[in-house]
Amino acid sequence: MRIVFMGTPDFAVPSLEALLKSEHQVVGVVTQPDRPKGRGQEVVFSPVKVVCQREGIPVLQPLKMKDPVFLDELRQWRPDVIAVTAYGRILPPAILTLPPRGCINVHGSLLPKYRGAGPIQWAIIRGEQVTGITTMFMAEGMDTGDMLLREAVEIRADDTAGTLAPRLAEVGGRLLVETLRRLEAGTLMPQPQDDAQATMAPLLKKEDGVVNWTLS
């Protein structure tokens, strides 16, 4: 199948690399715009863009997801599927409905728990012993689409987001390729999420890191 991949940080790299090793054709990648970082405000490419440069993959970096020029370029890639891992932007309906076989997201939790941008951090904060990866068809809501495949991953006693995320990312890449294999074979069985069991995992703010020294 013709795949457009959308992703930005280190967490997304194993998904892209798994696609590149698969039988599918990655026809293009969408990643966040280059941004200045650090004291020197040096422009830094996203980890996903670095892989694309190494592999010679066409890249789009739209400032606005509804930009007509961007949408036209995306259509010209003629994707069968858009695969998304930690892209960092909400996709508008014009993109969600573009590929004939749908948009598939790799999410860093066992949905419907921990919907949102910070599932790994919040699973650790809440003292979970198990988290995982869910692949799902994307819908207009925040991580509300039908689930496709799920795989549990143990949270070790000494895990931080920095140690847990790479393990989840590797599982995510493998699960994404398996999801696409089953999609092509017609053996996927999408499961609606139980909204009553849903919890949210918003992006952490600075104040979330404040230690309350009155707690023992």
Where are these regions (language model features)?
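Amphipathic, non-transmembrane alpha-helical secondary structure
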Residues: V13, E17-K21, L71-R75, V177
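N-terminal glycine-/serine-/threonine-rich beta1-alpha1-beta2 phosphate-ribose binding loop
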Residues: Q32, P36-D80
